């Protein structure tokens, strides 16, 4: 499974590799070879390489030598290196090709080059860039095609935030491992096509795994022919407020029905929608695939999971009522806002799934949104650990953690930035919980399913026109593509067993 690491882990791994006997000069040579292969693949002959004063710049100087030795037209813009290994390649460049070097301060627009290779800043950047470096980045961004070494310059490699500008790359060649900043915040918008170059560094430190279809496939069991709806769980969805009036009731009835549909399409046996008594007449015309009850009926039904909080408004009694129900839970929206004001109630939700967006998480933690986005993984991990919960911190890349394990879900698209998309996610996770999939795995798989389905929908329509209901109705396409191999293998194995039993029977019959 693919994974990302922090800048601290990368530096530690780098240091251990050098101590093991592989020199920093050799590592730069390997990284520059990977960049050279990319330049050769692109077919560029007129190339600008922009080098900073650190080891990222050293990769650039080593690359420049390879490009010039191969006969390509290269202009090198750079600063004098501050590290010995980078200085090694800088000195060779100045001995052999000094006429191809220009101080970075004299760099102008790079629009005339076929390829610009960004080796300005590496993973060590912290805080705001100076005006000087911001101007360098602006000039790099004039390039026709930009390849960044390890991380686009100006992007924080841990939290993915621009500082406040960054190179906008067409391709980013991550050295040895993805960094968390490649995926968080602005990372997905500025990295372009992401690739890893293996330069022989063993990774130490924590790994943040990136959810894939194989993980999701392993969460599901085969639906046997000899089974019934009770085998696949009862998912309860407790939503809606009686304070909606007029057209608002109709709108929310439609939204709540999407929750039920997303739950059923992921495979639970039953879905029960619990809404205020006054909303029942509006629900009857909208819902065709779920049973509908009032909030008052919640105690009368045995449930395997509850998805709760969507559109309930300020309703303390309902919150406490739901928290007392003994089953798996996913808590979202207004129920999270209730917990922010009543933190003692978190003790009643051990092992449950919380799905806040950054503003809701800000209310829960007491930290500002800016503080959270500056260090989202560690803050989410600590909150989950302190409260024995599973946290899904939603974003362009969602962070799913139980305090010990942390996954990054990179599936999804900007078309999910619409009201109701979070409701679909809640329904999906609620359904997985009802099917007895452990809470952490259900949260991880649910995020991937929702995001992957959104990508499929966007391909067929657009990120502008797609609606949350489109995701709910299209979940089957995603599950079909993920699970078809699992089902095929199951039946192949079944046939093998039947064949073995038949052969064994015939042998025994012959011996008799």
Describe the residue ranges of each PLM region.
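Small-residue (G/A/S/T)-rich helix-start motifs and N-terminal tracts that mark the onset
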Residues: 1-76, 81, 171, 182-328, ...
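Nucleotide and nucleotide-moiety/phosphate-recognizing core
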Residues: 36-119, 128-149
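Short, conserved loop/turn and helix-capping segments at secondary-structure boundaries
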Residues: 87, 131-134, 163-166, 374, ...
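Alpha-helix C-terminal capping/helix-to-coil transition sites in glycosyltransferase folds
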Residues: 111-112, 142, 168, 302, ...
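Rossmann-like NAD(P)-binding element
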Residues: 115-128, 308-314
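Internal gly/pro-rich beta-alpha loop/helix module
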Residues: 120-207
């Amino acid at each position: 499974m693919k994974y990302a690491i922090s800048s601290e882990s990368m530096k530690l791994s780098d240091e251990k590799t050098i101590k093991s006997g592989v020199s920093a000069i050799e590592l730069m040579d390997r990284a520059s070879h990977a960049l050279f292969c990319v330049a050769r693949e692109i077919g560029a002959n007129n190339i600008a390489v922009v080098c900073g004063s650190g080891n990222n710049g050293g990769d650039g100087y080593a690359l420049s030598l390879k490009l010039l030795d191969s006969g390509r037209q290269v202009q090198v813009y750079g600063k004098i290196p501050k590290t010995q290994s980078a200085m090694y390649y800088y000195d060779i460049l100045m001995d052999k090709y000094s006429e191809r070097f220009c101080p970075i301060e004299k760099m102008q627009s790079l629009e005339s080059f076929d390829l610009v290779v960004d080796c300005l800043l590496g993973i060590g950047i912290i805080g705001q860039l100076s005006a000087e470096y911001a101007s360098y980045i602006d000039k790099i961004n004039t390039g026709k095609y930009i390849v960044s070494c390890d991380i686009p310059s100006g992007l924080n490699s841990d939290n993915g935030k621009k500082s406040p500008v960054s190179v906008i790359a067409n391709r980013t060649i991550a050295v040895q491992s993805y960094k968390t900043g490649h995926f968080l915040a602005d990372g997905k918008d500025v990295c372009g096509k992401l690739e890893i170059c293996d330069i022989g560094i063993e990774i130490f430190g924590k790994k943040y795994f990136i959810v894939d279809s194989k993980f999701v496939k392993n969460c599901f069991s085969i639906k046997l022919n000899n089974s019934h709806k009770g085998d696949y769980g009862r998912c309860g969805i407790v939503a809606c407020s009686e304070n909606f009036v007029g057209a608002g009731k109709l709108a929310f009835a439609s939204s709540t029905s999407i929750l039920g549909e997303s739950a059923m399409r992921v495979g639970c046996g039953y879905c029960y929608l619990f809404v205020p008594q006054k909303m029942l007449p509006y629900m009857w015309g909208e819902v065709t695939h779920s049973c509908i009850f009032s909030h008052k009926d919640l105690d009368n039904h045995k449930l395997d999971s509850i998805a709760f909080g969507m559109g309930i408004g300020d309703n303390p009694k309902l919150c406490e009522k739901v928290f007392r129900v003994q089953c798996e839970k996913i808590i979202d929206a207004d129920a999270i806002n209730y917990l922010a004001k009543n933190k003692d109630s978190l003790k009643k939700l051990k092992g449950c799934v919380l799905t806040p967006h950054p503003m809701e998480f800000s209310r829960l933690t007491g930290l500002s949104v800016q503080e959270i986005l500056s260090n989202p993984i560690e803050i989410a991990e600590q909150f989950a650990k302190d409260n024995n919960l599973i946290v899904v911190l939603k974003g362009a890349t969602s962070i799913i953690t139980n305090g010990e394990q942390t996954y990054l879900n990179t599936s999804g698209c900007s078309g999910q930035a619409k009201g109701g998309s979070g409701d679909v996610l809640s329904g999906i996770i609620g359904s997985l919980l009802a099917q007895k999939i452990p809470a952490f795995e259900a949260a991880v798989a649910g995020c991937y399913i929702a995001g992957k389905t959104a990508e499929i929908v966007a391909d067929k329509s657009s990120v502008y026109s797609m609606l949350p209901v489109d995701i709910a109705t299209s979940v089957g396409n995603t599950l079909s593509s993920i699970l078809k191999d699992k089902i095929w293998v199951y039946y192949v194995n079944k046939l093998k067993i039947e064949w073995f039993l038949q052969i064994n029977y015939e042998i025994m019959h012959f011996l008799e």
